[in-house]
Each structure stands twice: as C-alpha cells, then as structure tokens.
A protein has these predicted regions:
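Short, small-residue-biased leader/transition segments that mark boundaries at the very start
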Residues: 1-4
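ATP-dependent small-molecule kinase phosphotransfer cores
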Residues: 6-108, 182
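Hydrophobic/aromatic beta-strand patches that form the interior of the parallel beta-sheet core
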Residues: 11, 71, 115-117, 169-171
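Residues at the C-termini of beta-strands that transition into short coil/loop
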Residues: 14, 120, 174
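Conserved catalytic core of Hanks-type protein kinase domains
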Residues: 27, 50, 74, 119-120, ...
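Short loop/turn elements that form and flank the Walker-type P-loop nucleotide-binding site
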Residues: 65-66, 111-112, 164
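A glycine- and Lys/Arg-enriched "phosphate-lid" helix/loop adjacent to the NTP-binding pocket
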Residues: 77-157
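NTP-dependent small-molecule kinase module
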Residues: 124-203
C-alpha cells in the first residue's frame, strides 16, 4: 500500500559520532563520578538533550518537517527511565518526568514520539547478553550504568511505571518455555509486533 511510498529515516542515540555527544562519553566513562548517582538527573539529561538537539537540527529536522517518518533507536524516553530511577520518591520522579517533557519537547522543540515500543527483554536474559557484548563506550566493562546490577533492576521496574504513564507498547523479546528457561523471539516475530503498532498510526 501507500505505506511503502512514505519516506523513512532511522536515527540512534546517543550519536557517538557527533561532537555533541562528548559530555555523554565522559559521563558514561565515569569521568564525572564512578557511581550513577554522582551526576544528578537534571545535569545528565541536559547532556543527552543537547545530543538529540544537534542530531535533529543537523540531520533530520527538515526531513521530519516534510512529512518523513523517523524511527529512533532510543530517544528522550530512554533518558526518562535511566534518570528517574535515581529518585526513590514518587513526587521527585513525577517532577523530573514533567520537567523532562517540558525541557525537550517544549524548550528544545524536539518532536514528541507518536508511539513508543518498549522492546521488553527479561533482566536475566539482558544481563547475559551484556556480558557477551563489548560496550560501545567502555570496552568489555560497558558503562557505569551497566555494571550496577541493583541499578538495572530498578530500571527494569521503572519501565513498568512508564508503560502505564505514557501508554507505551510493550513488545516481548523472549518467551518463557516450560523449562522456565527463556528463548529469544526471532527478529521477524519482534518486527511483526512493532509493525503492527506502526501500521495503526499511518494514515
């Protein structure tokens, strides 16, 4: 149908090839503190927002304004979860999320997503996958977030809050078999679920 005639562009964040991402690299490498709590969410979020703004302004603003479809691999939504977990208090979390929405979508003028698909990977599976992966930012050790198990547990729990608050679409990436071991779903299966969400948005 007409969907195949629509222009589509994919973007990924952080954009490590951009000079705008340099503070993020420093942050993830632990140059501002080795613990995830050493940099408060408002400061950390500002770094990521600048990276997204630089990408938007230099790479895809005109394309987007001309009706192009943007598929983002991580976006403001990733920042929400990774920073909100630094607050235990619900009021502080809510205040931060309210601030972040205003900061990026109003002050910075970044486009608000029409839909968010959460690719939901069980924590025990994702930790195995991370152990096998060499991190983009810090060699075999990943980054300061990924080395902290308690932090990853908190992040996984926080996704539940965000799914409810923003009506995100949860896409399971693994199935639990009778043996209680998880099996990864195929790329095609995951793609079909994501496409089902997108199809409903297209005119």
């Amino acid at each position: 149908g007409d969907v195949y005639k629509r222009q589509v562009k994919s973007v990924s964040f952080p954009n490590y090839d951009s000079g705008a991402a340099m503070p993020i690299k420093m942050y993830l490498a632990g140059e501002f503190g080795k613990d995830v709590h050493d940099v408060n969410p408002y400061v950390a979020s500002s770094m990521y927002a600048i990276d997204r703004f630089a990408s938007f302004r230099t790479d895809w603003e005109q394309f987007y304004n001309n009706g192009g479809i943007i598929i983002a691999d991580r976006y403001t939504t990733s920042n929400m979860v990774h920073q909100m977990v630094k607050y235990d208090d619900l009021k502080e979390r809510t205040a931060f999320l309210d601030w972040l929405e205003d900061f990026e979508f109003q002050k910075f003028g970044l486009p608000k997503p029409d839909a968010v698909c959460l690719l939901d990977m069980p924590l025990e599976v994702s930790e195995v996958l991370m152990a096998e992966r060499t991190g983009k930012t810090g060699g075999n050790t990943g980054d300061i977030h990924e080395g902290n198990h308690a932090y990853l547990v908190a992040v996984h729990d926080a996704y539940e809050e965000l799914v409810k608050r923003y009506q995100w679409h949860r896409i399971p990436c693994a199935d639990k078999a009778k043996s209680s071991q998880y099996t990864l779903r195929t790329i095609e299966e995951i793609h079909n679920d994501v496409y089902g969400v997108v199809e409903n948005l297209l005119p």
